């Protein structure tokens, strides 16, 4: 199992880095869009959309919202509406998250709150990554920075949690996560941000960049817990089986759903 997980991770990671640095933005948008659609399909399944017709309608809704926002040019980093839209997204997610914690659905019952939450997490996350990739000459490197940040946070949290972990972060949703692991992930993110200043040749506020990185790192934990809550409510261990040793696509992008939109929105203020 571990060998399979490492092999899948190595192949997926290598291909992702190559695509981000080599592909033009339209090509990357198509490739990443396919990846996100698979994640959206898994989200629909976890939300108890049991028929093919309902799942296809759900995918259509995701695609239509994506096209609509893109057409309105809200995914442009220079647009003042972009931070406002993502702020609204954050508020909606917070409200729906609270609702999801309080009100559990019966097994097999379609969860419309989760479907709505899926629209306002999957779509902004996807558009944020594509927007940052095509926004500047160093956009591909910045997108890679965001993706690698989550890997760094996960790695730091894993080793810190394994060494010092005692206090459970969310025993019901994710028994393996501890507060010590979260702190370890944030410490790793701090050093990563300092290295990123030089790698990206960052010319704006260094303190602001580090703080934005730490905010995104913190929110990545929220995204992870959010997906854990969705899977728990659906009675599923993984979001899917498409990635051997890793589960589904959602299991790989859950941290991005919360972190990427806010990080990219924060870039608009520099």
Stretches found by the model and what they are:
Residues 233-255:
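Interfacial loop-to-transmembrane junctions
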Residues 2-214:
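Membrane-embedded alpha-helical bundles of polytopic integral membrane proteins
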Residues 217-222, 249-257:
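Hydrophobic transmembrane alpha-helical segments of multi-pass transport and channel proteins
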Residues 222-238:
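Transmembrane alpha-helical segments of integral membrane proteins
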Residues 264-270:
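Juxtamembrane boundary at the C-terminal end of a transmembrane helix
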Residues 6, 43, 155, 225-228, ...:
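Generic detector of well-ordered alpha-helical packing
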